[in-house]
Amino acid sequence: MCSIMGYCDCCAAFSDFEEGFKKTVSRGPDDSRIIDTGKGLLGFHRLAIMGLTPDGMQPFELDGSYVVCNGEIYGYEKIKEELAKKYTFKSGSDCEILLPLYREYGVDMFKMLDAEFALIIYDGEEKKYIAARDPIGIRPLYYGYDKKGVIMFASEAKNLVGMCGHVMPFPPGHYYKDGEFVQYCDIAAVDEVCHDDLETVCKNIREKLIAGVDKRLVADAKVGFLLSGGLDSSLVCAIAARQSKKPIRTFAIGMSEDAIDLKYAKEVADYIGSYHTEVIMTKEQVLDSLEGVIRMLGTFDITTIRASMGMYLLCKWIHENTDIRVLLTGEISDELFGYKYTDFAPSAEEFQKESQKRIRELHMYDVLRADRCISVNSLEARVPFGDLDFVKYVMSVDPAKKMNTYGKGKYLLRHAFEGDYLPHDILFREKAAFSDAVGHSMVDYLKEYAEGLYTEEEFKEKCEKYTHAKPFTKESLLYREIFEKYYPGQSEMIVDFWMPNKSWEGCDVNDPSARVLSNYGESGK
């Protein structure tokens, strides 16, 4: 995944910078470098995925300007071919095009990128720093100010805690220049609603998702797939299996007692002919990993933490037992096509508003989870449902078509792939939350553990000291206390707990799990 960090002033304390930067070395264990630009420091931990030679090591330099980028730029070859008329390239790295691109187009370059990225540029001519993040926030970036008021940027909040008083996520779809954050893209906004008929919409969804998977299979390192047996990851794997000349490698995880996902994942793996691995996790592993997972994530959010337990342990197994470096996942489908709770949306307009809210906040929840669970194990996450062309198109589709008006949630996505991509029962399987589907017992163990830590009086007393995102269950209090241990006073990095829209009838619940909704039905079976 790589890790980047920047201190934007000439009076940097190198040892403090180095100490903060070391905290994310697992994101890029292949090589590390910190350089003094003359006006500050830039750091880079490398995980080599594209252009595996030493020439691909960052920071890249061009006439006194520098760039560090944690990113994947799709279709960079065409851009590089055009730039090669004026510039010389030394490596096969996709990120080497960034400085020539900046030289030609300035900050307008960010609108041109089909990429997931976080970057910091030092402009040697203007003697100033520019930072930017992709429109969804798939690649992480945080910022804060030190005691002297100097801005710092880093891949994770843990790099900056202790150096900056207040750490915040860098807003997706923005760049920073001259002391201001400027929005260059609002991926959730819709300029013109698409009123194509159902079959045309589904055809476009199919073609655009296939293209999104296709471009994410390109890597100089080995690629694998997380397969839960749910609709989203199963589609990614099925598409990839068709594109690959040999069996793809798929991985699934579940509790030893009651893993719902494992049987469905195996059914998909058998159907698409993948080389499939099942990993079993135990109650002891879950509880032993909890504090480390919260420290890794940098969140107190209940559903993010629950869903991270299985994902973290699975990625840990992959890191320790295979030579795979890249993992494709199924995140971002729910935000586009709907959750179980969006069945309760009172109107098409409300459905669309909720989808836009979820897309704009993704970087604090599911995208954060996937990034941290995968990167802490020195792997790279790629998210086909986050393909910019795909997201823009689905967001533009008439929301009346995206609502559950066909008797099945995510009907457009399911109908788009009817045929022989997946077994019918998988394609039309009811949604189950990942944290539930790895085994209902996992969430029950976490709740039970938290319940045993506090009396009712202690619970009420401890909750009172929190004003932002106040804990409301013993489980949420436990997570908050662990979070505060490693990120003291930084709770505003997360806007609030991820919960269904409580203003909708049927959604005023006290737990983020879809299990508590009246329409959960057969999802957990």
Predicted segments with their positions:
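Structural signal for conserved beta-strand scaffold positions within catalytic alpha/beta enzyme cores
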Residues: 44, 91, 183-186, 252, ...
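Acidic-aromatic/histidine active-site loop/patch
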Residues: 98
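N-terminal glutamine amidotransferase
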Residues: 1-68, 72, 101-196, 203-214, ...
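ATP-dependent adenylate-handling active sites, centered on carboxylate activation for C-N bond formation
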Residues: 8-14, 85, 104, 125-130, ...
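Conserved S-adenosyl-L-methionine
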Residues: 184-185, 423-432
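A short, aromatic/hydrophobic, helix- or strand-capping loop or linear motif
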Residues: 27-35, 90-95, 141, 405-410
